[in-house]
Design a protein with these regions (language model features):
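Short glycine-/aliphatic-rich beta-strand segments at the starts of folded cytosolic domains
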Residues: 1-18
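Interdomain "pre-motor" coupling segment immediately N-terminal to P-loop NTPase/helicase cores
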Residues: 39-103
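Short amphipathic alpha-helix segments
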Residues: 15-32
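Conserved helicase motor core of SF1/SF2 NTP-dependent helicases
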Residues: 44, 112-121, 132-239, 243-327
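Conserved adenine-nucleotide phosphate-binding loops and their immediately adjacent elements
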Residues: 103-115
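Compact, well-ordered interaction domains used in eukaryotic information-processing assemblies
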Residues: 28, 32-43
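Flexible hinge/switch segments at interdomain interfaces of large molecular machines
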Residues: 1-4, 101-105
Length: 327
C-alpha cells in the first residue's frame, strides 16, 4: 500500500507545544492508536503512513489544533486523558467541536493553580447539572470522576460563598463489614471508608488549608448514619457510594436538605455491597425521583472513564460478562 506524507501547519509554536503535551505524550498516543509517524518540523506537523491512516491522523491533528486554539483551561497542554478522549471521539467518527467548549470549562482551580473541569461529554453534562440543580444524582462506573467533580463543585461553592460549609458522607457498609464489629474507636473505624473523600479534598485544597477548615467544622466528613435527625442549611452535601445505602437511609438522607443547600448523590448501581435481596437506595431513587422538579439525574458510562486506559477495558470486559445480550 502506498505511503504518503501530509503537512499540517501549526498556527504558532506555543499552540504546537500545547498540542504535543508533556514529554510528547500526544504524539506518542496518536502513533500508538494509528499506524503513522508524526514529526514537528519548521512549524508544521508532518504525518506519514498509509494513505487512509495518514489522512485520518492529519485530520485529527488539525482538529486537536483547533481545540488547543479554542482556549484550553489555564493555557495548559493537552493531557493524556484529554487526547485519549478526543481520539475515541475521532475514531468513532464524531466531531471534536464540542470538545473546545468542554476543555475550556473550569469548575474550580486548585490551591496549586491547576484548573479542574470536565474531560468528556458526560462529565460536561454532569458539571452543568452540578451548577444548576439543587439535588443531583450521578450514576456510573469507577473512574468517571463522579466523586471528584462533586467535591470540586462543593469547594467552588464554598469559595464563591454560595454555601457556608461542606458535608461529605458515605454509608459504612462495604465488603460486608459493619462499624459495630470493627475494632478501634469511631475515628479509626470510619477513616478507611471515608479516605477517598479526604484524598479528593487534599488534592483540591492543600493539607494545611483543609485541616483548618476541618478544625472550624466548615468541612465535615461523617458516616451516613450520623445524618439522622439533622437539617442541613447553607451546606453543600455529598453522599458518595450511595449504592450501599438502603432505601430507608436514602430517604432519610434526601429529607435532610435545608434552605440554601445543595445535594449530590453519587454511586454505581452495579457495585452494591448490601445483603442479597436488599434493594439499593440509589436504585430505588433512580426509579422514583426522575421528573421531580429541581432534581437532575446524570448517567456516566465507560466512555467517561478518565483513569488509566486499562480501567476502561476492565469495565468493558465486566459489562460484556454481565450483559452479554447488549454485545
Amino acid at each position: 500500500l502506498q505511503k504518503i506524507e501530509i503537512q499540517v501547519p501549526a498556527p504558532d509554536m506555543e499552540v504546537a507545544r500545547l498540542l504535543l503535551g508533556t514529554n510528547d505524550e500526544t504524539r506518542r498516543l496518536v502513533e500508538r492508536e494509528l499506524p503513522v509517524t508524526i514529526q514537528l518540523r519548521d512549524g508544521n506537523f508532518l504525518v506519514a503512513g498509509e494513505e487512509a491512516e495518514a489522512q485520518r491522523a492529519a485530520g485529527l491533528i488539525g482538529e486537536l489544533l483547533e481545540v488547543v486554539k479554542g482556549g484550553m483551561r489555564g493555557g495548559r497542554p493537552l493531557s493524556a486523558a484529554d487526547v485519549r478522549y478526543l481520539l475515541r471521539q475521532a475514531k468513532g467518527g464524531q466531531s471534536v467541536e464540542g470538545a473546545k467548549k468542554m476543555l475550556s470549562d473550569t469548575l474550580v482551580t486548585t490551591e496549586r493553580g491547576k484548573p479542574i473541569g470536565p474531560r468528556t461529554a458526560g462529565q460536561k453534562e454532569y458539571v452543568d447539572a452540578l451548577r444548576k440543580a439543587e439535588m443531583c444524582f450521578a450514576v456510573g462506573p469507577a473512574g468517571t470522576g463522579k466523586t471528584y467533580l462533586a467535591v470540586a463543585a462543593a469547594v467552588a461553592a464554598l469559595k464563591d460563598k454560595k454555601v457556608a460549609r461542606i458535608i461529605l458522607t458515605r454509608p459504612a457498609v462495604e465488603a460486608g463489614e459493619r462499624l459495630g464489629f470493627l475494632p478501634g474507636d469511631l475515628e479509626a473505624k470510619i477513616d478507611p471508608y471515608l479516605r477517598p473523600l479526604y484524598d479528593a479534598l487534599y488534592d483540591l485544597l492543600d493539607m494545611e488549608k483543609a485541616a483548618k477548615l476541618f478544625e472550624r467544622k466548615v468541612i465535615e466528613i461523617a458516616p451516613l448514619a450520623y445524618m439522622r435527625g439533622r437539617t442541613l442549611n447553607d451546606a453543600f452535601v455529598i453522599l458518595d457510594e450511595a449504592q450501599n445505602a438502603t432505601g430507608a437511609q436514602m430517604k432519610m438522607f434526601l429529607t435532610r436538605l435545608g434552605f440554601g443547600s445543595r445535594m449530590v448523590v453519587t454511586g454505581d448501581i452495579t457495585q452494591t455491597d448490601l445483603p442479597r435481596g436488599e434493594e439499593s437506595g440509589l436504585k430505588a431513587a433512580a426509579r422514583i425521583l426522575p421528573g421531580v422538579p429541581g432534581i437532575e439525574f446524570v448517567y456516566l458510562g465507560k466512555e467517561d472513564v478518565v483513569r488509566h486506559t486499562l480501567v476502561q477495558r476492565v469495565i468493558e470486559a465486566y459489562d460484556k460478562n454481565e450483559n452479554p445480550e447488549r454485545f
